[in-house]
């Protein structure tokens, strides 16, 4: 069974750069405290690392 990540948006992207806004949107997050579950792949890890100051990540 592959690992999954539960990603939660904790801070707003208002005031962030365009790249940060698009990265959060690409993860499937729109609202604060919204959570999504994604496969633990290098691409997802890279997106999470880019906006880690806005997110909380847990392994599921």
Curated annotation (Swiss-Prot):
Keyword Membrane applies: no
One annotated GO biological process: translation
Cellular component annotations (GO), alphabetically ordered: cytosolic large ribosomal subunit
Keywords, alphabetical: Ribonucleoprotein, Ribosomal protein
Protein name in UniProt: Large ribosomal subunit protein uL30
Family as reported in the entry's similarity comment: Belongs to the universal ribosomal protein uL30 family.
A molecular-function term among this protein's GO annotations: structural constituent of ribosome
SUPFAM superfamilies linked to this entry: Ribosomal protein L30p/L7e
Taxonomic lineage of the native organism: Bacteria, Bacillati, Bacillota, Bacilli, Bacillales
Quaternary assembly: Part of the 50S ribosomal subunit.
